[in-house]
Amino acid sequence: MEKIIGLMSRDDWVYTGLLLFSFAASCYVRKLGNNILASGALGFAMALFIIGPRIAYSLGICAIAVGIQAFAPKKKVPFYVFLTTFTYLMFVRFAHYFLPVVEVASHTNVIQLIITLRIIGITFEENDAWLHKNDENATKRYLTRMPTLLEKFAYFYHFCGLFTGPYYTYQMLLDSQNPALQSWDPTPEVTSRFVRLLWSVPAFVITNHYFPLDSLRSDAIWEVSFFTRLVYAALIFVVFKTRVYSAWAIAESICVILGIGIYPAASNPKIIVGPTDLKVFEGLRDKENVEMNSDAIVNLDIPKVEFSDGFRDGMKAWNRSVQTWLALYVHSRVKFMRVETTMLVSAIWHGTYAGYFMSFGVVAMCAILEDVIFKLVPVNPETGLRPQWFRILYTHTIRCRGFEMLATGFLLKNASDVHHFWSSIYYWLPLLCVPFYIYSVKTAAPKLKLVV
């Protein structure tokens, strides 16, 4: 028994228990009619059981956000909520340094992260619906019904995705109440995800056992060759990916069972946006025996994560719900340095560790590096691809080795640990990116101003 327990960390075992319990609960909740308030109460009870009094951290920002939504000027509500929520997130993470409170870490931090996304997301949903309430020919789908106070708190603490993600909108939660979904069979969708577990779980357990992250923190890393260090970083990345592949296979299955993110395939649903062909959706939404899919909740595109040609495609395929959240509520709404601002918000959201900022800061430069290189090696108009020699060379050097290095920074977290390992591989990726980034900034076309 001790050997079995030793295969994973305590946190991993807790997450496994939470996921399995949530999966069983989702089956039961579906049979009872998929009630939102009951699911919110269950999620709150689970959070209270796992983190105890530390649930006060998330309750605090929920109450503050609801107050802002109720009393702030309508047009300014999203800005106030966004700013307040992230300021609060930073405050509670540092509060234990100067107040007699427990640190926001582990499961408490994860709950805080998910609720942060939900608070800001529902605020934008409400505001967009209010701004476009008189649009008769809307080309985009807006919130169909404003939530009550209890429904908001139920959404914030809904057990589905509360501990692992994926993120989903309040409108997606409302859509899951469609009676037509009660007759839809989720078995094929769930089965396809459980097939993934047949290879992702063994791969995680084996690599996690034989290639511990602490090896990168030890001085022994300096005693092996540069090539060996790169290989070890690649194996650490395998541990990280297979852990996430496994967790999200179950997390997505929970969403599927509850009908979250399930739409008619013909309506062309997109991740967290839902159906994009609104005419088709309106015609099929209440019909039974219609082909459905879960594209709106698929959080990973594993083939692209593993085999895409570049950084941008690889990043977009990873944690797609959060990537889309960042695109909708950050990238599309800022006026300058969009990639850099988006990566900064992503780093702040993940935590206060230097490793997050180091990794996400380099990601922004990697995107610029890739743009410059791709311009130098254009796509063949006949094949739609770049030369095969270039794709092989770029993928297996900058792209793959780069992602592996960035993953070590994300996992090691502390500045000293990240520096310890990154210096052993000579900071090769940032040093490669910086000249290209400077070149891109210097040669950026200035915006023309129209003088009247």
Swiss-Prot record:
It is a multi-pass membrane protein. The chain crosses the membrane at residues 4-24, 53-73, 79-99, 104-124, 153-173, 220-240, 244-264, 354-374, 421-441. Pfam families: MBOAT. Glycans are attached at residues 137, 319, 414. The active site is at residue 350. Keywords: Acyltransferase, Glycoprotein, Lipid biosynthesis, Lipid metabolism, Membrane, Phospholipid biosynthesis, Phospholipid metabolism, Transferase, Transmembrane, Transmembrane helix. Its EC number is 2.3.1.-, 2.3.1.n4. InterPro entries: LPLAT_7/PORCN-like, MBOAT_fam. It is found in: Membrane. It catalyses: a 1-acyl-sn-glycero-3-phospho-(1D-myo-inositol) + an acyl-CoA = a 1,2-diacyl-sn-glycero-3-phospho-(1D-myo-inositol) + CoA; a fatty acyl-[ACP] + a 1-acyl-sn-glycero-3-phosphate = a 1,2-diacyl-sn-glycero-3-phosphate + holo-[ACP]. Pathway: Lipid metabolism; phospholipid metabolism. One of its GO terms (cellular component) is intracellular membrane-bounded organelle. One of its GO terms (molecular function) is O-acyltransferase activity. GO terms for biological process: egg-laying behavior; lipid modification; multicellular organism growth; nematode larval development; phosphatidylinositol biosynthetic process. Its main location: membrane. PANTHER family: LYSOPHOSPHOLIPID ACYLTRANSFERASE 7, PORCUPINE. Acyltransferase which mediates the conversion of lysophosphatidylinositol (1-acylglycerophosphatidylinositol or LPI) into phosphatidylinositol (1,2-diacyl-sn-glycero-3-phosphoinositol or PI) (LPIAT activity). Prefers arachidonoyl-CoA or eicosapentaenoic acid (EPA) as the acyl donor. Prefers sn-2-LPI rather than sn-1-LPI as the acyl acceptor. Lysophospholipid acyltransferases (LPLATs) catalyze the reacylation step of the phospholipid remodeling pathway also known as the Lands cycle. Belongs to the membrane-bound acyltransferase family. This is Membrane-bound acylglycerophosphatidylinositol O-acyltransferase mboa-7. It comes from Caenorhabditis briggsae.
